[in-house]
């Protein structure tokens, strides 16, 4: 009987943890800011740097100036 109660408790705890991870708002890795020694290359590259990875890739394909910020 104690084993069943323990297993039910562990299963419910696991479900609560999974639900919290799904609603936690985690959006992926935080992008690194550009190094301080390098001056900003312009408003277009700065805007590309703040976009999602897929949008940055699209921006780099059309505006080749942003690609080196993504590779860092």
UniProtKB/Swiss-Prot annotation:
Residues 1-21 form the signal peptide. The modification Lysine amide is found at residue 71. GO terms for molecular function: chitin binding. It is found in: Cytoplasmic granule. Disulfide bonds join 45-59, 48-66, 60-67. This is Penaeidin-2d. GO terms for biological process: defense response to bacterium; defense response to fungus; killing of cells of another organism. The modification Pyrrolidone carboxylic acid is found at residue 22. It holds the Pfam family Penaeidin. GO terms for cellular component: cytoplasm. Transmembrane segments: none annotated. Antibacterial and antifungal activity. Presents chitin-binding activity. Belongs to the penaeidin family. Keywords: Amidation, Antibiotic, Antimicrobial, Chitin-binding, Disulfide bond, Fungicide, Pyrrolidone carboxylic acid, Signal. Its main location: cytoplasm.
